[in-house]
């Protein structure tokens, strides 16, 4: 019997970690126990819904059929993110779609950026690598069609389109570091 990712996140959010423990690997469970609250992100997401003009929201992928107006109208009268998502959600506008649109509003990701990024070879952003395995991995990355970002100097190998996408990645990392009160890696690979 397995839980869905949504159920696992809900259990962790509600502090029901014992129920989650049997459905995740031990290292994930340890991360969940020490995960910071997401309140700051939720406040930023509501702020983004309030501050972004409807015309700008309309440019977000999947924000169609007047959904931007619904989000903005409801955002004016809610006490927080969870209430906003709940009130915007309908059979037509499922909650995962609403949350994705709010995340895109926070990060400034519009449909054009998504479409351009999907049409281009971007990059391999190596988040972490074991020092003992790095020598095996480096030749693989060297023969890839995508530039591997292992150190800051590798950024110069990015095409203009890839750089545009990478800048959003870095911004997302900075937002995450801010809302979780953790240090930002600045896009650098961590060798462990």
Task: Cite the ranges covered by each PLM segment.
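Active-site cores that bind ATP or allylic diphosphates and position pyrophosphate for catalysis
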Residues: 1-192
